[in-house]
Amino acid sequence: MTETPIRIATRQSPLALWQANYVKDALMAAHPGLQVELVTMVTRGDVILDTPLAKVGGKGLFVKELEIAMLEGRADLAVHSMKDVPVDFPDGLGLVTICEREDPRDAFVSNTYAKIEDLPSGAIVGTCSLRRQCQLKAARPDLVIKELRGNVGTRLSKLDAGEYDAIILAAAGLKRLELESRIRSFIEPEQSLPAVGQGAVGIECRVNDQRVRALLAPLNHADTADRVRCERAMNLTLQGGCQVPIGSYALLEGDTIWLRALVGEPDGSQIVRGEIRGPRTQAEQLGITLAEQLLSQGAKEILERLYCDHE
């Protein structure tokens, strides 16, 4: 009897398909003879392109349809860019595997300027991320930030059409789509702290599906998983979402995790920063502890204001 194929739910954007095929290839390499199929679908996040994400439900718009497909048995797993995965999961589903992290940095893309510092006053910069906007406005309050939605190709086309002087994108996505040549410079974490989980690919499935969980086990990258769990524990404690500028980046130094994080106002007028070091065995607790420190240092008031504005 032929084993049932594994079905991967995925969005249809080039980057989503790259990620799904990456997991498909990894599964087939780890389990020769395994059949793996892609189940493509369109999410609300792909359709609603004329409104800022924070106003229409946040990044969860990109995963809800995939989760319904798994809960209804039409798919066995879903592949996500970890920076787009909400802090909470529906009953019966969970994040079971985190693959090795790609470059977590933001990338500066422009046809005219080599780096942020070269932009003239009043230059128009495109991003859909409040996190990037916050840090950019703090460093360069003289810049004009303009909403930028759509997949990577669409965003580059808008830049090329002259709608923006520069745009900020995730370096990982450009590298995966073999568009690294478009990157004029990388923005280091000291200048723009990445999003929670940025650059990592995560796999969600039904938590009681032991067959799928066993098949996925070889794809888990322990170092990346500890770093991302640390970042996500911080984000969960802050109840972070698309409506608030939150950045975090965890690094491993031997068996020690170094976590940096920030919470800020979208206009960059106030940013609360913090960092913590501790054993990787306590990755999640470190994230929780740093979040509590940020909350006590002014992040609580920022978050309350921002969430009130979106109610």
Swiss-Prot record:
This is Porphobilinogen deaminase. Binds 1 dipyrromethane group covalently. It comes from Vibrio cholerae serotype O1 (strain ATCC 39315 / El Tor Inaba N16961). Signal peptide: none annotated. One of its GO terms (biological process) is heme biosynthetic process. Its EC number is 2.5.1.61. Belongs to the HMBS family. Monomer.
